[in-house]
Amino acid sequence: MKHLPILIACLPMFTWANEQPISIQNEFNRFQQQTKKQNEQFQQVQQQRWFEQHQYQVEQQENDQADLSQVCLPYSEIQFVGFHLIDPLPFAPKKNECLNEDRLNQLSQALTAAYLALGYIYNPFQFEDDHSGKLTMRVTEGRISQLSSNSHRLNFSMLLPNSLGKPLNIKDLDQALDQANKMPGSKVSVDVLPAKNGEIELAFVNEEKSRLTGYLGLDNFASKRSGRWQAKGGLNIDNPLGLSDSLYLNVSHSLKSYHHNFNRSLSFFHTIPYGYWTLSSFGSFSAFKSNVPLQHHSVEQKGHTWQAALRGDYTFRRDSNSISNLYAQLERIKSKSYFQDSLILLQSPTLTTVQIGVNHLQLFSYGSLITDFSYERGLRWWNATLNQGQDQPEGQFNRWRAELQFNAFYPIKSQTFHQSSRLIGQYSRNYLPAIKQEELLGRYAVRGINDFSQSAEKNIVLRNNFGWLYQYKQWQIEPYLGMDIGMQKATSPDADSQKAFGYAVGLKTTHPAWYMQLEWATGRLFQRNQIVQERSINANWYVMF
């Protein structure tokens, strides 16, 4: 096979399938683009669970003070006792100021607001009169004395580490609930129970489902050569290590053939909470095999990819309507691509990368917004592919990526309309391996063209859906219209930019036990010398258990 590079050079650049010109490298690129999306999908599932469990919190209105007495009380000043978490002096009445019920109520509200601004929610006040002409305002700052639960899945040393004896902070409590509710089979709430001497018991209640939940389904997202249809399944395990952790297992396989043309994948995602920290590990194996028809015979191409990652997230800011995270990730990818059993080096990178980023989730009264910005650097560690020279894929690279996801719900009379938008942008001056390029076409980008893969280092895609939500008992039905636009340009100085446009009509049906989506889409790719157009019908169905 030493003459294989010459053989490949002599092959036609395009082979015809379903009257559509498909590049010889198309299946390699398509496979690697699908592989890299698996970790991103797990992260999006976690974010979606957060939105499902939270509603926008309206700011509290001030109490009506019309009935409070304006008569001055016989006190010359106020002394504060028991204040350690805030400084009460900036709120103290001025010397010789009239102290009446109205003024004391204003003082109580101001001090309560100061506590709440820092997240401290249980700090009862008491006024004491020692007949000295001074009014004592005593606060009992609530501290956690006991943690209890009806569930063995809740490990408080992981959810609320080192919390006993410390002041109760709503941010710590919300963080613990978010971490606990990442377990798919758990729905955790908490009761705050005052005890003696200002102590507080936190009683956690878990409406448990089975520790094992999951889904089984079918879709036609696989490539045309593997027969489109693939079976998929997932298993979610609550608390497998006793650390209030979560384990997700996913598998998929094309239905048409087990030995000839196929796509298959296996992946896991594991998260361990520790207060404001989350440690995640991810691993996947994906493989494909495809026979490419030529004019007089066919050739075989195949490939597989191993992927593993460790990630740490830290929540550095949160309130009732938002949460902000910093994260860092170390990733290892080893990909092999073969043409007629010979290794294609340019399509077989071994990569070690480190990624840092910031993520923000925001709730509004009418919807939500997710923003994510990240930087990724390719390293030389562990025999990673080295830079081969000019115009060759580089193992050491810099990659910037941004993503915004916006959802809004508009009530118009008795109807509800749903808008969802997703903007993805990537930039790199390096020649990136295919698995690190961003896709312009397909299920995660401009819809409609499923059998023609186009990816590049510089890329921006905007996806939009606008639908009508109809609720009937436990059913939610959403017919929708979609429109996508995108543009990309490779790093090569003589590369032309490419643009794509797509539109879609679809129907989503959601039930607590199952989900179904059917979508018809048309996509157009605008290249320098031609316009590629394709229509597709995508179906996705799964049942949950």
Which residues does each predicted region cover?
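Residue-level signature of outer-membrane beta-barrel architecture
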Residues: 237-239, 272, 314-316, 360-362, ...
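Repeated loop/turn-to-beta-strand initiation elements of outer-membrane beta-barrel proteins
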Residues: 188, 212-214, 241-247, 275-281, ...
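Transmembrane beta-barrel strands of outer-membrane/channel proteins
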Residues: 192, 216-220, 247-253, 281-287, ...
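C-terminal outer-membrane beta-barrel translocator/porin domains of Gram-negative envelope proteins
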Residues: 338, 343-483, 489-491, 529-531, ...
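Residues that define the transmembrane beta-barrel architecture of outer-membrane proteins
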Residues: 198, 227-231, 262-266, 304-308, ...
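Transmembrane beta-barrel wall of Gram-negative outer-membrane proteins
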Residues: 258-360
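Outer-membrane beta-barrel "beta-signal"
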Residues: 235, 507-516, 533-545
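Periplasmic polypeptide-binding modules associated with outer-membrane biogenesis and secretion
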Residues: 18-222, 252-264, 423
